[in-house]
Amino acid sequence: MEQVLKKMVKELEKHPKDFNIGHVILAMFYAEGGLSRARLQELLGLGEGSVKSMIKYMKKHRLISTSRAGSKLTEKGVSMLSKIRVFVPKICRISLEYLSVGKINYAAVLRGIKISEILRIRDMVVRFGGTGAVLLFYKDGSVEVPYVTNDLKSISDRDHIKICEIGPKEGDSIIIVGGEDKASTLKALGSVLLELLAHQA
């Protein structure tokens, strides 16, 4: 998986597009069961031309197939997504209060990924167009906010419930990424996920 992702990144760096590899990863999550191009635009917050270009790019790499019904992951795409899901089982939009880091917030559950440089992750999110990021740890049924509290529930019961609703398991990390709009938030989230996944087997 690492080699495939690096190859795709190099290609996009050589020939820049209106989308990045992060959008491709997120599109794979959304296109698993098949969906229309218009729906993909809505989900990713990208324009028609950008989505059209991204679909063409994904077809070139045999990740999706298209028909009148829309786009759907190929066998290769499903295989790659299953490998990604080992490390990132869930991505979703989330409504938060205390933990909010932007007008739009998205959460990703990270499993088996060791993260030691929290500030570096936050800086990376801002560099890729996001407004901020928070990294959480799920331990013994509690949500830890590093350097703040060992139990989110003691600060915001509502946010604790929202985080638990996305289904983290013991030892998981959860990254919250915020942005001004859907497109910039997902671009930042996808870029960070790519950075983390590129170092996994």
Predicted regions and their residues:
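A short, conserved structural fragment
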Residues: K59-A69
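Mid-protein regulatory/catalytic core that forms ligand/cofactor-binding pockets
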Residues: L99-H199
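Basic, amphipathic "hinge/linker" alpha-helix immediately C-terminal to the N-terminal HTH DNA-binding motif
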Residues: A69-I84
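Short alpha-helical segments that sit at the start of domains
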Residues: M1-I25
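Short capping segments at the starts of secondary-structure elements
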Residues: Y30-S36
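A short acidic, leucine-rich amphipathic alpha-helix
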Residues: R39-L44
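Long, charged amphipathic helices and adjacent flexible linkers at domain junctions
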Residues: V88-V101
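Short amphipathic alpha-helical interaction segments
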Residues: G45-K60
